């Protein structure tokens, strides 16, 4: 009977301890409004961040932070027309039982410079106009829609999405997938591992993938296409003075609206087939059309196919 009593008491103590550890407290729950803000800088930590541009000039920030770990805060500071929002934590007590949730939701004018940097979570930006918008995340998802101006996206792992950008896009992702659609300017993209999809690109497109596949559609001009291991498929993608293909293992398959006779071609494959229009060869294909520009390609194991 005593053993049963002791066991019951121990179970109750463990349950109480677990309940105490996992109890969540609201640390931040506030809405702040600002006028005459031209630039916002956010250091979000693990918090989700969103920005919605709209009519008016007032900036409104809704911040919420709930956690079972104390010593966390969201700090606001203004310096002239710059608003700085920072997640702060002085605690190192995180463990397997840590539970937290929170966000920073911002609404404000369309014309505003924005820079967001975080460690994890999600970043979602819509309807923004600035010379440069910078979004950086260690792990998580980054999405930007209806952006006027240049856009920089960076993440170590996760997903990058950009749509309707009236400017250039520079994107870097270590591991994960990226989707771009409706980019009026040039695109420079690099990734170590993952898949890349790009549609309706109005400028020069450069792609560098260590491992993964690239699917391209409606691209004004292809630049450097470098894929160490993987495949590139392009439909309605233009050739230009900077077009070149480089790969170790995989295939480059391109359907282009460009005049094939307006370019020279120097293509090489250690093991594989090479084709331009109706002309195909193994290992080496040289076509001299007395053109001003030459399309170059080199693949160790795989094929390069360029057709109309």
Q: Over which residues does each language-model region extend?
A:
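Intrinsically disordered, low-complexity terminal regions
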Residues: 1-308
């Amino acid at each position: 009977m005593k053993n049963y009593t002791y066991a019951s008491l121990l179970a109750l103590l463990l349950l109480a301890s677990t309940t105490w550890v996992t109890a969540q407290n609201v640390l931040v729950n506030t809405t702040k409004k600002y006028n005459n803000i031209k630039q916002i800088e956010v250091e979000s930590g693990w918090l989700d961040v969103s920005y919605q541009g709209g009519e008016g000039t007032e900036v409104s920030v809704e911040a919420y932070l709930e956690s079972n770990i104390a010593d966390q805060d969201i700090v606001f500071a203004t310096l002239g027309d710059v608003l700085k929002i920072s997640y702060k934590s002085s605690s190192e007590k995180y463990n397997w039982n840590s539970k937290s949730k929170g966000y920073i939701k911002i609404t404000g004018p369309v014309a505003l410079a924005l820079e967001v940097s975080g460690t994890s979570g999600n970043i979602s930006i819509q309807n923004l106009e600035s010379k440069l918008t910078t979004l950086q995340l260690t792990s998580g998802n980054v999405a930007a829609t209806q952006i006027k101006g240049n856009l920089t996206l960076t993440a170590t792992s996760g997903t990058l999405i950009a749509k309707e950008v009236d400017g250039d896009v520079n994107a870097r992702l270590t591991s994960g997938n990226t989707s771009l659609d409706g980019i009026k300017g040039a695109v420079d993209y690099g990734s170590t591992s993952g898949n890349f999809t790009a549609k309706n690109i109005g400028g020069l497109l450069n792609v560098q993938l260590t491992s993964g596949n690239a699917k391209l559609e409606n691209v004004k001009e292809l630049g450097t296409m470098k894929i160490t291991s993987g495949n590139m498929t392009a439909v309605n993608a233009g050739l230009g003075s900077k077009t070149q293909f480089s790969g170790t293992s995989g295939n480059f398959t391109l359907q282009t609206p460009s005049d094939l006779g307006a370019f020279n071609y120097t293509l090489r494959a250690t093991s594989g087939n090479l084709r331009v229009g109706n002309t195909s060869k193994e290992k080496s294909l040289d076509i001299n059309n007395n053109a001003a520009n030459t399309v170059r390609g080199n693949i160790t194991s795989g094929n390069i196919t360029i057709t109309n």
